Amino acid sequence: MLDMTSICSAFRRPRILIIGCGDIGQRVVTQLLSGPNAHLGKTYAKPKIFALSSSPERFAELRQQGITPIGGDLDHPETLWRIARLASNVIHLAPPQNEGEHDLRTRNLIQILSQGAGSVRRFVYVSTTGVYGNRHGDYVDESSPPLATSQRAKRRMDAESVLRHWAIHQGVNLSILRVPGIYGPNRLPIE
């Protein structure tokens, strides 16, 4: 006999798409899969995690971590069709391309997600405190106006602006995290 409770809970299982599943993305996944699955008195199924990857050689590694790899490349929007309706929650950790003042990768991403007709409900974008520019030691907090001067920071500001506009028009709950320098194994700011 079918257990309808189990079947119904499988359909409520959160689906999370990670864009940029490198060091930080994998740490996020570890927390998502190992953390408590109860919140405010409700118990939830562990999330189903997908990761966009342009490197097929990483697929086996991602699968070992409990992640379902999805082939695609933010620089080639024609490869992104698989993610249009894939998940209701998106965590965007991928950096912008290396040149220009506009983040074409984020633009490509939201263009394809817009084809999902409202399937994305929550979107987290990891930006950088670099958007505040060099304040020469002055105090900076989230209410400080951005003063992006580098091309990279301008691309991040562009992504934030485009995402805000998209989120308002799509009814998406958007969170932008402006993270300072990220350090870890092989990520130290010394030569």
Show where each model-derived region lies.
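Conserved Rossmann-fold NAD(P)-dependent oxidoreductase catalytic core, especially the SDR/UDP-sugar
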Residues: I110-Q151
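N-terminal Rossmann-fold cofactor-binding loop
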Residues: F50-E57, D73-L74
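NAD(P)-cofactor binding segment of oxidoreductase domains
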Residues: I83-Y125, S161
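Conserved Rossmann-fold cofactor-binding substructure of NAD(P)-dependent oxidoreductases
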Residues: R63-A87
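Glycine-rich Rossmann-fold phosphate-binding loop(s) that bind the pyrophosphate
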Residues: C21-G22
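N-terminal Rossmann-fold NAD(P) dinucleotide-binding loop
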Residues: G25-Q26
